[in-house]
């Protein structure tokens, strides 16, 4: 299902019969100005401005998945770096000063990074994202960066916890005894054992990012109109919930199916890549 959604989003320009932002005059609206329902000309009808709804749903998939995958790449990269550095940095000692006045001090890198992660975890991320986007101005790139910059904490905690366990195992102790640097141990011996875990949670993170983007767009601080976005489509037609619920149900169902498909994909990957499952 996730692959089908990605294929539809990637081929939106080829599949969509109309420009998603083009208001079709004449046949795009009823004589009284209401949206047209599903027909042979318009597969899923039109919206309040006479734009083809099927075309907007397809391009909305592209927008939502672009933000979801892009934000998740940011979150996964930042979270992996923070968790990796925190698990192996410890509290390095530095010396400053001149001659007899040189002093040694330890910098608790591990503690600093993980306490900072806890602080970010405690923040109301939706309110913070709304504030950041409202101050700077909404755009596709900004929304992607903001979402990724707020969702990295879960990956950081997971990577940190797994690497703390791995660094005490015999193969890591042996590599350290042979003189391998912390950098080599991390990237050559430990990280390969964490990649499968990162892939699983990265897949689950796409679902969270898509839902996050839809929430921001619904509140008017996400992808700016007239760009097609499922959250924008729901927001634009909030007043049609009685007269034409199709305008709300279709993008809502698209969001639900996308989140569900990536959650199921993440669960399947976790079962397939879990070494304990196969004994």
Task: Please tell me what each predicted stretch does.
Residues 1-23, 113-116, 194:
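N-terminal signal-anchor/first transmembrane alpha helix
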Residues 3, 49-279:
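Alpha-helical transmembrane segments of integral membrane proteins
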Residues 11-55:
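Short membrane-interfacial helix/loop motifs at transmembrane-helix boundaries
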